[in-house]
Amino acid sequence: MFEIGVIPVAGAGLRLYPYTESTPKTLLEVGGQSLLLNNIAILRDQLGVKKIFLIIGHQGERIRAAIGDGANLGVQIEYLACSDISAGLACGLLLLRDHIHSHFPVILGDELYLDSNHAQLLRYAAEPADVVCGIKTTGDTTLIRKNYAVTLQGDRITSLEEKPEVIKNHYLGCGTYIFSPAIFDAIENTPASTKTGRVELTEVIDRWAQQGADVRAAVLKGSYRNINYPEDYISAMNLYRKLHFSQYRVSLVIPTYNESAAIGDVIEDFRDKVDEIIVADNQSPDGTADIARAKGATVISKPLAGYGAALRCALQAATGDILVLMEGDASFTADDLPKILAYMRDADMVIGTRTTKQMIEQGANMDAFLRWGNVLAAKVLQFLWIRQEPRFTDLGCTYRAIWRDTYLTIRDNLSAVGPAFSPEMMVEVLRAERKIIEIPVTYRPRIGDVSKHSGSKLAILKTGTKMLWLIFKRRLGFR
């Protein structure tokens, strides 16, 4: 076992903006746990580390406040402050010189390892090398270009190259290392990089290997992400979701007012396909709440200001990991739910579009005026957030799914009480730099009264104007 481990967490994370606007990047969460806690667990549980040094810099006090002394984590945590984070990782490691006198593992704080085999590195505690680098085999050369490449002879590394332009093999260098204390001299003896003007750790190890140091490669298993950019963080969250998708619970939330003609059929349609159904009923006088209860739904019946208020009420009560929203008028079908959930593996929110003509059933409330009005309004939203390259064709479709953690991220910014709640959700997910995928869904004739929001051209214009006004205000930074 290794007595001491190290996690460098000093970086500013500027490339991860806006996620790092108020949160250090190592405290970003994937699957409900921060990157830092995940890596602390690897050092503690797989490598037997009892004491961990965190090299802090940017927002270091926030990290210290979040992690503490490690007493509640079963490991001792000590902090070393790096006064010049621009000096780079290698120089940051020099802070350890007076604290470490034996081989020690290092895991970079902005990396994610899932189901890894770090425990195999324990053999290097008994058979020490000068350096051990964790590597993975990959067919994705883009990942290698973002990290570093290695050249091997057996398990011995003969050279390393940071962010290579030419890929010579399928070995991806990771931010897991084991160093001997001699690494400190190697760092001090390495000149600054001609590319960056600072001493680069990869160049230190490469130079040392070519001088005859014993530098070994340990092949890591499991899933891995190096998180430097927003797309890396999104990829990491999607990776975690895919690995655990079968374990997630699905909640269906339905706002209702006088939906007695349809609510029973809606619940029957979805009951076997979700884990719970929450109905937020605006004290319907027609017995909607009683029918929903009889069909097994959890019903919240109280005065509600409108569609958006009812949905917020239902979402607050839902316990699922994936929250599915839809109407109680039977205009949507559970047959589309499997494909919505399939796309949730790769998105933070999946929204339906009712503008695919072939999927609009005869008699549905979607004439050319309403359909093309939705398309036009959706394109306005798409244009205003063009940097994120969304693709929208329907601003008002209320059949959608969102991850619970994504909803919690945007919840405090949701205030619309009426139908503008639907585009408001889209806007806030985009503002949070999260991913939305739109897919076509079947749209059927509504059962019950005509919608007061889309039952006439005047109602459509009023509703559309409110939606667009909200979108423009949010784009300009107003609430």
PLM-predicted stretches and their roles:
Residues 1-7, 15, 29, 33-107, ...:
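Conserved N-terminal catalytic core of the sugar/cofactor nucleotidyltransferase
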Residues 123, 153-225, 230-234, 402, ...:
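Catalytic-core segments of class I nucleotidyltransferases/pyrophosphorylases
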Residues 1-21, 241-254:
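N-terminal nucleotide-binding beta1-loop-alpha1 segment
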Residues 146-155, 303-305, 309-316, 334-419, ...:
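Acceptor/aglycone-binding surface of glycosyltransferases and processive sugar-polymer synthases
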Residues 34-43, 256-273:
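Short, well-formed alpha-helical segments that are part of the catalytic scaffolds
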Residues 114-195, 355, 371-380, 398:
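Conserved core of the sugar-phosphate nucleotidyltransferase
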